Amino acid sequence: MKFFVDTADIKDIRELNDLGLLDGVTTNPSLILKSGGKIADVTKQICDIVQGPVSAEVVATEYKDMMAEAEVLAKIAPNVCIKVPLTLDGLKACKTIRTQMNRMVNVTLCFSANQALLAAKAGASFISPFVGRIDDTGSDGMELIQEIRQIYDNYDYQTEILTASVRTVNHVKQAALIGADVITAPPATLKALVNHPLTDKGLAAFLADWAKTGQKIG
C-alpha cells in the first residue's frame, strides 16, 4: 500500500518524507488556503521534497477552463498529478489530460461505485473515494472501497484506489485489508499508526532492565 499525506504544510511533509513513509501528497483548495501560500509556490515546494505524485486541484467547473488550469499546474513540476472533480466536465478533462498531456490524473469527490467506474473508463490514474464523509452520513465508507475493488478487479482496470477522507487508523487498516492501492491521510493520522500501548509498556520494561545492568553501548 502506498502512503500519501493529505496536507500542504511543508514542515509536516518534510518530516514524514525524512522518515521514509511518503509515496505522494494530496492537496486541495482548502489545504492551500490553510497553508497561506500561493498554489504554484506551495506545489513547487512540495514537489521539490517528494518524488512521488503531488495532486494539485483545478478549481474551474467547465471543461475548457479546467484544461487551461491543468496546463498551468502541469508546468510546475513533472510529478504534479492533476486533480479534477467527478463531474462530466471533469471526466472529459481527465480523458484529455491522460491522452494528450500524458499526465497523471486524480479524480476526486467520489461517493459511489458508479462514479468510480466512470473514472476508470476515463483513464484516471487515481480515484479518490471519501470514506470519512460517507461515514458522516451514517453509511459505511469502507463498503464503497470494497465495491470499487471488486469492479476494478472484474475488468482489470489500472486506476488506483486512493482512499481519501481518512479520519482514523482503523480506516487505514480496513483499506489495507480490502486491498486499496493508496491511502491519503492527515499527518497526525499517519503518525498515529505507530502507536500501541503494549509497545510503550514493553519498551519501558526493556529500558528499566537495561539501566540495572549499568552498561553502555559504544
UniProtKB/Swiss-Prot annotation:
Pathway where this protein functions: Carbohydrate degradation; pentose phosphate pathway; D-glyceraldehyde 3-phosphate and beta-D-fructose 6-phosphate from D-ribose 5-phosphate and D-xylulose 5-phosphate (non-oxidative stage): step 2/3
InterPro entries in alphabetical order: Aldolase_TIM (IPR013785), TAL/FSA (IPR001585), Transaldolase_3B (IPR022999), Transaldolase_3B/F6P_aldolase (IPR004731), Transaldolase_AS (IPR018225), TSA/FSA_arc/bac (IPR033919)
Main enzyme class: transferase
GO molecular function: aldehyde-lyase activity; transaldolase activity
Localization per Swiss-Prot or TrEMBL: Cytoplasm
Keyword rRNA-binding: no
Catalysed reaction equations from the record: D-sedoheptulose 7-phosphate + D-glyceraldehyde 3-phosphate = D-erythrose 4-phosphate + beta-D-fructose 6-phosphate
Active-site residues, Swiss-Prot/TrEMBL: 83 (schiff-base intermediate with substrate)
A GO term from the CC aspect: cytoplasm
Keywords (A to Z) from UniProt: Cytoplasm, Pentose shunt, Schiff base, Transferase
E.C. number: 2.2.1.2
One GO-annotated biological process of the protein: pentose-phosphate shunt
Primary location group: cytoplasm
Family: Belongs to the transaldolase family. Type 3B subfamily.
PANTHER family named among the record's database cross-references: FRUCTOSE-6-PHOSPHATE ALDOLASE 1-RELATED, TRANSALDOLASE
Alphabetical list of HAMAP family matching this protein: Transaldolase_3b
Its biological purpose: Transaldolase is important for the balance of metabolites in the pentose-phosphate pathway.
Protein name in UniProt: Probable transaldolase
Organism: Mesorhizobium japonicum (strain LMG 29417 / CECT 9101 / MAFF 303099)
Name of the coding gene: tal
